[in-house]
């Protein structure tokens, strides 16, 4: 865990993550595209590094300014990172959570994968929410505070 967090710190300080994300974000035009790319990058970090904390921290730091520029509430970023980062880690055999569950219960990850409904459906619902705009909150223009609707 310490080594992976160190790797994440090095990547952030070198500016590699920000450079890649900024070049990608410039090509995105719609809000739903930003949300889906955030989700996919969080899943990608999970797959390549296998550490759920980095799958939230790296994309979170990289995309937070893009969300603010587009006027999207940080709650949407938080939810997207959760859907693509934390809950997916149980499905990655070499991930921290996946290896813990597999070793604790003695069941390989690929065996319990079809029954992990929440982990499988959460990213799907996040994409549906982004495309339809349901649950996507925006900030007020003047104050950049969350808009609370009753």
Regions found by a protein language model. Give the residues of each.
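Juxtamembrane/interface motifs at transmembrane-helix termini
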Residues: 39-42, 55-58, 76, 95-101, ...
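Alpha-helical transmembrane segments of multi-pass membrane proteins
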Residues: 33-46, 70-91, 97, 114-121
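Structural signature of transmembrane alpha-helix termini at the membrane-water interface
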Residues: 11-14, 44-48, 91, 102, ...
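Alpha-helical membrane-embedding segments
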Residues: 2-8, 54-65, 93-106, 141-150
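Juxtamembrane and boundary regions of transmembrane helices in multi-pass small-molecule transporters
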Residues: 98-103, 107-150
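Hydrophobic transmembrane alpha-helices that form the pore/transport pathway of multi-pass ion
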Residues: 45-83, 108, 145-148
């Amino acid at each position: 865990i310490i080594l992976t967090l160190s790797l994440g710190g090095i990547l952030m300080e070198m500016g590699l993550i920000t450079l890649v994300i900024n070049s990608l974000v410039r090509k995105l035009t719609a809000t739903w595209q930003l949300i889906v790319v955030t989700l996919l990058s969080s899943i990608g970090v999970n797959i390549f590094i296998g550490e759920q904390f980095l799958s939230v921290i790296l994309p979170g730091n990289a995309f937070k300014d893009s969300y603010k520029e587009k006027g999207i509430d940080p709650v949407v970023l938080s939810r997207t990172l959760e859907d693509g980062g934390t809950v997916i880690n149980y499905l990655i055999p070499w991930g921290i959570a996946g290896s813990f569950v597999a070793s604790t219960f003695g069941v390989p990850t690929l065996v319990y994968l079809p029954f992990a409904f929440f982990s499988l459906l959460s990213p799907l619902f996040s994409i549906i929410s982004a495309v339809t705009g349901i649950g996507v909150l925006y900030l007020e223009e003047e104050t950049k505070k969350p808009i609370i609707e009753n």
